[in-house]
From Swiss-Prot:
Main localization of the protein described in the UniProt heading: cytoplasm
PANTHER family documented for this protein: ARGININE--TRNA LIGASE, CYTOPLASMIC, ARGINYL-TRNA SYNTHETASE
Protein name: Arginine--tRNA ligase
Subcellular locations according to the entry: Cytoplasm
Gene Ontology BP, a term: arginyl-tRNA aminoacylation
EC number annotated for this UniProt entry: 6.1.1.19
Family (UniProt): Belongs to the class-I aminoacyl-tRNA synthetase family.
GO cellular component, one term: cytoplasm
Record GO terms (molecular function): arginine-tRNA ligase activity; ATP binding
HAMAP family, per the entry: Arg_tRNA_synth
Reaction equations catalysed: tRNA(Arg) + L-arginine + ATP = L-arginyl-tRNA(Arg) + AMP + diphosphate
InterPro entries, per the entry: aa-tRNA-synth_I_CS, Arg-tRNA-ligase, Arg-tRNA-synth_N, Arg-tRNA-synth_N_sf, ArgRS_core, DALR_anticod-bd, Rossmann-like_a/b/a_fold, tRNAsynth_Ia_anticodon-bd
Any Pfam family matching the protein: Arg_tRNA_synt_N
Amino acid sequence: MNIIDQVKQTLVEEIAASINKAGLADEIPDIKIEVPKDTKNGDYATNIAMVLTKIAKRNPREIAQAIVDNLDTEKAHVKQIDIAGPGFINFYLDNQYLTAIIPEAIEKGDQFGHVNESKGQNVLLEYVSANPTGDLHIGHARNAAVGDALANILTAAGYNVTREYYINDAGNQITNLARSIETRFFEALGDNSYSMPEDGYNGKDIIEIGKDLAEKHPEIKDYSEEARLKEFRKLGVEYEMAKLKNDLAEFNTHFDNWFSETSLYEKGEILEVLAKMKELGYTYEADGATWLRTTDFKDDKDRVLIKNDGTYTYFLPDIAYHFDKVKRGNDILIDLFGADHHGYINRLKASLETFGVDSNRLEIQIMQMVRLMENGKEVKMSKRTGNAITLREIMDEVGVDAARYFLTMRSPDSHFDFDMELAKEQSQDNPVYYAQYAHARICSILKQAKEQGIEVTAANDFTTITNEKAIELLKKVADFEPTIESAAEHRSAHRITNYIQDLAAHFHKFYNAEKVLTDDIEKTKAHVAMIEAVRITLKNALAMVGVSAPESM
């Protein structure tokens, strides 16, 4: 339990003890503690006096006064109490309790903010999963940034997380990839008789693959068409996936598992789920096609599994894949999908219900569109290539840290304008620079302290920390673990970037109001330990969203 929860629990226990002591109720109802909207009304407030009115048969203000008169303020860490309005009780805490967070942060280091106990739940988080047919773009970048941050947050909150990328290496798009490579392969050999398929891939990367294969494996030209296309499918996917993996690694995004769609066919899992759905009576034949009765489970219409030409829809392997996720022992399945996949939510949930799996175990987040902006105008195409701007170009333009931070700053269900000019600014108007500068500034002070012979230690006397800005800063440090738990519960990575901005702002305010290194040695030691706790917190929070914490800037 974090320090904030400990203090709240103690306050609730002491209020309950006070009610008993005052003889207000034999059975005490739930005591709710809330943080007042206006900090002038205290650190915490409760309406328990009004709740007790019918039980105690007294005026709520009288009840409130009785609670106040019988409260052990020392045990409750309370220095002042006000009764407001019809009977609200406002508590102002003795903030010395907050200083306990300093040694805790220093001792835990990189693990500060992480919960100590496992939730005992396995989470499979699938994100990015771009088709291996070209470069990653800004939409994939947002998916990667949010997905990786969410994996870090859930891990810190005590979940057992598997990060997975689903490789769409089967289906028509891979056939089109193979046909496109075939055309470029023969062109490189001087044979222009192979035309590009209607839905082919015309990128420079396909030309490069064709040239490379013509140079290294000219013997492929003598293969049968079937064997040749099989080879081009395999080599094309390998080439594109190697490039995608390299870009994602540079973007500081890593996966535990790369799951191949082809493996579902090879292991017979698609036929297995199809047979199971038929056996359970959830499929039917109509218009020469095989349908799944997803309307039985709140979908707006039934879905085709096998088309009238005998080919599978994308939905069938998707069902097999999600059933495989369940079979692997995952309690929670989280999918991060692009904006064009909104219609998938109900049908995928319905498909799980056909197997008796609670569809609430599947959570789908839709990543809304991102617009790249420069000088107030949308940038749609790369100036260098004339094509859509790639993840690699974004990294080259603004850097990994800025890209990761900006793409995690907003809720994924909201549209977002990525200001590339702001992301490159080295000023405090740039959110990531502002946060990183706070860390670098702390490192500079700690370096000066060390030069003066003042070492960071968790065993200081912290009673000298009384400045209002210092207390507010410590409150923010103490709020780190609750913020992680909240971000994990709501699957909201942007709660961490919001926290980082607030923490950096509180530090800058403290820095401007209070000198850390002074002639008062005991106070200096306490402040040095405090800002080390802030530094650890800031570094851990930045790491959670995949951003570095530089020691100098």
